[in-house]
């Protein structure tokens, strides 16, 4: 695995000569608006299709990590060759760490993804292009934040910490060049992203992006909207609660995310918070085709973990659930952006019936994880025979789970293995023990990933996504939750995995294409289904949710 070390280019850090340093009215929670009642609009739904989950940083690259350059275009050609219709990526926000989920702005693209090859090909930009930049399109809070981001914002001078206007004006004047630099970097990112997306869409492929539920404390979002978060507003401005999840009923352990909690239930800020989310979703949907909202369960109730104001240590023994105004929130979203928003929701974790009721009320597309389908009985909603059309099914749980091969050889229980074997064997005598003369378990140690892919593609879920590591039968996972990369450690680091083109053999390409065509996932993706038809389709399995 390559370490996450990016080349030093003119755009990854400021040049040495730069000094360091109207509200909408929303419907109250309750029945859907009369406008939506009168018009049963088509709900955007993925047609029967398949694709690959691969973050941009995992593309091959001579520069340390993958970027928006030639290798990304080559990957699109591979998707076309194998009849794939979907490319799912992880968040592409600017971060100060390898994790794509630790963004310093929910509105700024990541400068590490800028392609040096394309900069060379384009000769950067002309003076005319620079003059014509519409600066209002770029996130000014992010530019202001970055120019002073040598320390966490709660340690800045009081006037900047609380965003007093005279202090902001002074900084803008004193650090004009540095702020303009960050605006310039965002311009370059936007141009390269537009070029790639046009190629993707011209190739009849859709991009799915992940949008985290929470944002980092040390971010432009929290700094510029601190009143919308549960912070110590009287003194330190540090979080009084952080987000996380307890252990659920499946194989997943609890987590502490150390991200501040939105002040969802404060009547004085709720409308502004909704507006911020609307702008965030609108921005993302202008750059990708579908959004997968992480931790959808948090819109029913969010798990709050108290923290010590002085030490900032989380206290999980006193953590608890707090109701979230999710219905009101999604009503505001649909009234502002339309009822046909292309959203996929991660309806996983410690789920209650209310989660599925909220999802289905707004006709949102859910998620199914095949790796979680064999630890329970036949009513397990993650078992492939229980998938519904309006869902996207994955081989594994994206970035936080072991790869299929690692799960099978290192983590799966005997019960899970036996249940999987019973699930796939044909009903003929002797088949349980032998396949082509080999013992079945030994056979599966070698071919488990292809069995998973075939079962996934056979399912009723309209979307089927393969994690790239699973396609390559790899043991290397993307991330281990609750751990951080260690630069002193010479082994695989979180978020550092990259594939090589030599791994995508002719056999893999042919087999993937054949399975895609065999199970009808190479057809058109621009299908819609009315909410009435969807109710009929899902009715037979809705009780499982």
Report the location of each language-model feature.
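Asparagine/serine/threonine-enriched low-complexity, disordered tracts
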Residues: 6, 13-16
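Positively charged, lysine/arginine-rich intrinsically disordered segments
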Residues: 7, 22-24, 34, 540-545
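Gly/Pro-rich turn-and-neighbor structural signature
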Residues: 208-212
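Structured C-terminal cap/extension of enzyme domains
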Residues: 474-534, 539, 545
